[in-house]
């Protein structure tokens, strides 16, 4: 198991949102594998507030998670799981509408990158980012740009895992990293609305 699948909790909103998106998406052929993300510490439960550090050690010290902004740790808002599930269901609906517009070549190329265990995490994240940006330009959408790109990133996660279920943990972790880097503030705004 890769070390980058563990979280210090700073990306728990992104993890919850992606997990709920995958659970709500139609045509998700790896549904039975989703609980393995929780059991292996990839997904932190808000109720339990259990997270793993980069060494895979369980952290229960009660520290609140946060996000760096201008070099300062800004606490994340409390996350209401019901709101996250509702937003994820709405995003999954949008993803289902965009699904057929994603060319198999884009997914196949991503699968090949994820299968290459010699590629560093940053390179795979860059490949995911390029795929999302390319799709966002190519797919006509009346969605706001951030929402379209967020949905596309999560949809690509589903499509890669559908094609190669053994990549679920790696693609989940990479997508959470990408979403956390690019859409954290957008997700916070969605949760507050």
Curated annotation (Swiss-Prot):
A motif (BH3) lies at residues 87-101. It holds the Pfam family BID. It is found in: Cytoplasm; Mitochondrion outer membrane. Intact BH3 motif is required by BIK, BID, BAK, BAD and BAX for their pro-apoptotic activity and for their interaction with anti-apoptotic members of the Bcl-2 family. Apoptotic members of the Bcl-2 family. Forms heterodimers either with the pro-apoptotic protein BAX or the anti-apoptotic protein Bcl-2. Induces caspases and apoptosis. Counters the protective effect of Bcl-2. This is BH3-interacting domain death agonist. It comes from Gallus gallus.
